[in-house]
Amino acid sequence: SVQVVLSNGTVCDAQIVGFDTVTDLALLKIDPTGLNLQAATFSSVEGCSVADTVLAIGNPGGIEFFSSVTKGIISAVDRSIQDSDTGYVMHCIQTDTAINPGNSGGPLVDLYGHVIGITSSKIVASGYESMGFAITYDEAAPIINDLMNYGHVKNRATLNISLALAS
């Protein structure tokens, strides 16, 4: 089972609508009855520029640092990042905003509160600092639509193999 913790601390059971292992995105559904939720506003990265201030919201290290906010700037608007395992190329916003384990999947927002990306990764290697990445809303929107409509990303090649032990 999956649970979601809302910004006010309310814990809700969630249903997995769909997920995409290539982009590490998942779509969850909760029952909104009586929760007084406000929908996020999403915005294209086209209105963003290098050096714009952005905020990352997440739970670095887990629930202990619930709903932490870090601030930084956009270092690159359309950085192509290739997954070394799958070869898939994602279009990302590069930012110096602190992105830590637990932030992944949280929103990257502009100063108007619009979600412009979904935090996804950072470079962790000697000689690199403050290189975080967020999948742009423009890249994520069609994936999220496919997850909502089909439970998976349509027209992406998959290899469905089941393994069994030979007796």
What does each of the following model-derived ranges do?
Residues 1-167:
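Serine-dependent protease modules
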